[in-house]
């Protein structure tokens, strides 16, 4: 579980994960605005699980089990641990959990985050809806 003292590390992970995507989609990264958005999400406790490999923190998963779906708020892997199958393995575990509950695994992905969208499509996620800034995707 994420602890309050993890919050700055989580922000840096968020920044590393989304900086290029946000610039591609919105044209710039406004540090003050991004910090405000990020920290406002943490004003109430979030179901965050820090992913560790050995003694290293390498990512985070924020999953909420709702009545009609498992909602994947975030899955972020440190850039130097990406492309090694960790995200795919985590998604498989999350999908198995959703299937055991008999609900789909749902998420949103920014339009400009094509690497993530390709990963989700490869895993079998279907695009359900195109929103203003995101694709809504799910897999059963």
Regions found by a protein language model. Give the residues of each.
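A short beta-loop-alpha structural element at the N-terminal edge
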Residues: 1-12
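Conserved GNAT acetyl-CoA-binding A-motif
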Residues: 69, 98-110
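Residue-level recognition of the GNAT/N-acetyltransferase active site
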Residues: 73, 78, 82, 110
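Conserved acetyl-CoA-binding loop-helix of GNAT-fold acetyltransferases
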Residues: 77, 83-96, 118-122
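Conserved GNAT-fold acetyl-CoA-binding loop/helix
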Residues: 15-40
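Conserved active-site alpha-helix within GNAT-family acetyltransferase domains
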Residues: 88, 111-136
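Conserved beta-strand in the GNAT
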Residues: 56-64, 69-76
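A short helix-loop-beta-strand connector motif used in the catalytic cores of GNAT acetyltransferases and
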Residues: 39-50, 59
């Amino acid at each position: 579980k994420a602890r309050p003292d993890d919050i700055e590390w989580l922000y840096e992970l968020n920044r590393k994960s989304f900086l290029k995507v946000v610039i591609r989609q919105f044209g710039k990264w406004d540090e003050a605005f991004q910090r405000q958005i990020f920290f406002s999400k943490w004003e109430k406790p979030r179901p965050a699980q820090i992913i560790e490999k050995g003694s290293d923190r390498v990512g985070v998963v924020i999953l909420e089990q709702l009545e009609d779906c498992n909602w994947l708020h975030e899955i972020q892997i440190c850039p130097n641990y990406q492309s090694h199958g960790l995200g795919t393995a985590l998604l498989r575990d999350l999908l198995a959990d959703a299937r055991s509950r008999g609900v789909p695994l749902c998420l949103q992905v920014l339009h400009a985050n094509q690497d993530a969208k390709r990963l989700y499509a490869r895993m079998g996620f279907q695009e359900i809806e195109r929103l203003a800034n995101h694709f809504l995707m799910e897999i059963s």
